[in-house]
A protein has these predicted regions:
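Acidic/histidine-rich catalytic neighborhood
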Residues: 56-114
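Conserved catalytic alpha/beta cores of large enzymes that bind or transform nucleotide phosphates
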Residues: 6, 55, 62-65, 80, ...
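Regulatory modules associated with amino-acid/nitrogen control
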Residues: 91, 95-407
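Short, glycine/acidic-rich hinge or "gate" loops at secondary-structure transitions
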Residues: 8-14, 61-70, 259-260
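Divalent-cation-assisted or electrostatically stabilized phosphate/pyrophosphate-binding catalytic cores
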Residues: 42-66, 267, 376
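Flexible, glycine/threonine-enriched loop-and-boundary segments that flank and lead into catalytic domains
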Residues: 7-19, 32, 52-53, 90-97, ...
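Short, well-ordered alpha-helical packing segments
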Residues: 29-32, 36, 48-56, 69, ...
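Acidic/His-rich, divalent-metal-binding segments that scaffold phosphate/diphosphate chemistry
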Residues: 1-44, 49, 59
Length: 407
């Protein structure tokens, strides 16, 4: 499981594991969580039954038995939620907290998730996965302790941020307030007030020009590229093309249109080993320079890098599965794409979206060994969901054809 000497790699898990009232329940859940695999049915529920029999045979209390069984059934829940859901959405946190119910279960589940991810493939445990799980844990804990703590309206988020900003010069605060007038509510819905304060450092210097900044939140998380530029066709595809050509991993994107004809995009990045790209490193400086040069052009022509698939990946054959649903609350279409990982995958996906006039509003990227599971929130050029069935079917068909090509 988790060793004390691993404090540097698993700081939160190392802290929590010492607070578990009965660590043996974590051990039993760890032993039985995958025992049902390969037996022709839902492995989690089968594992629950087998673990329950073990607990009964060894005279566990009913409460301890329920805890073990709950952990076995839900052992994938935290990993899936953190990887695939929008953790800035209060409803996501609320739903997860209602499933977990107690702080004790949350602590057990976090420790089991960390152990499971690391034991399955040590390379899957990186700064990005660690930060996602930590964020989900922290927000869920806040919800369990105070159900109103994470649900701030855009207006409340702005007010909290302004309170912190008051320590800055009044000229800076005034500039930030003026800049905020150009944002729609989605910007304030997607970030907490601490993030708004962090962004304000850069927003206070905004002019009518392209701005690219590498933001380091803290030493435990990955870097984010903040990009302010004219909002026009091909902005995101241009960014992805440059990231791909620089061999930089793209993990998450939040894209915001502004009332003044500009856009503000946030892209979470890492190097090829999954580690942070430091703000003043040579690769970061090269990235910033190339992005500014490309985005300063009046007409954007994204360069899609075509690279051969590594030989070792050709031995894995993952069928492409594309699923979608319309989200009328956010006025976009969510598209989940599961396919084989390969060089240039994101650029290929972006090209299909580009060819069909689809605008990407959000993206979440997840890679599991040779398999990629990516989520994109897209709209039509009219900023509406892709509701026309024939257009959506053509997009999906072309995406399938593109991703099925042998490289």
């Amino acid at each position: 499981m988790i060793l004390r000497k691993s404090n540097d790699i698993y700081p939160l898990a190392t802290k929590l594991v010492t607070k578990l009232p009965k660590i043996e329940l974590l051990y039993i859940a760890g032993l039985y969580h995958d025992i049902g695999k390969g037996r022709g049915s839902d492995h989690s529920n089968l594992g629950k039954s087998i673990a329950g029999k073990f607990c009964t045979k060894h005279l566990f209390t009913d409460e301890d038995k329920k805890t073990v069984q709950w952990l076995v059934v839900n052992h994938l829940l935290m990993s899936v939620k953190s990887q695939k859901e929008d953790l800035s959405d209060p409803q996501v946190i609320s739903d997860f907290a209602k499933t977990v119910k107690t702080k004790e279960r949350l602590n057990y589940l976090y420790c089991l998730t960390v152990a499971d991810v690391s034991a399955t493939n040590p390379n899957l445990w990186n700064s990005w996965n660690a930060s996602l799980l930590s964020e989900l844990y922290t927000k869920t804990l806040e919800y369990l302790e105070n159900k109103n703590s994470i649900i701030l309206s855009p207006k409340e988020n702005k007010a909290e941020a302004l309170m912190l900003l008051e320590t800055m010069q009044s000229k800076v605060v005034s500039k930030v307030k003026n800049t905020w007038k150009n944002f729609y509510s989605d910007y304030f819905e997607n970030f907490n007030y601490r993030d708004l304060v962090l962004h304000a450092k850069y927003l206070s210097t905004l002019e009518d020009e392209t701005l690219v900044e590498i933001i380091e939140k803290n030493s435990d998380s990955l870097s984010t590229v903040m990009i302010h530029t004219k909002d026009r066709a091909n902005v995101f595809a241009t960014i992805i093309g440059i990231l791909d050509s620089e061999n930089i991993n793209f993990l998450d994107a939040k894209l915001f249109g502004m009332r003044n004809g500009y856009c503000l995009d946030f892209i979470t990045i890492s190097d090829q080993s999954g580690q942070m790209i430091k703000k003043n490193s040579s690769i970061a400086n090269s990235l910033v320079t190339r992005l500014i040069e490309a985005l300063d052009q009046e007409t954007l022509l994204p360069k899609i890098v075509q690279r051969r698939q590594p030989r070792y990946l050709k031995h894995f054959n993952t069928d492409t599965i594309i699923e979608y649903k319309h989200d009328m609350t956010h006025r976009w279409t969510e598209m989940d794409i599961k396919t084989s990982d390969r060089p240039g995958l994101l650029a290929s996906i972006c090209k299909v979206f580009l060819d069909h006039g689809a605008l990407i509003k959000k993206a979440r990227i997840a890679t599991y060994g040779e398999r990629a599971e990516d989520k994109f929130c897209i709209t039509s050029k009219e900023n509406t969901p892709f509701l026309k069935k024939t257009e959506l079917e053509k997009l999906i068909n072309d995406m399938n054809v593109s991703l099925s090509k042998k490289k």
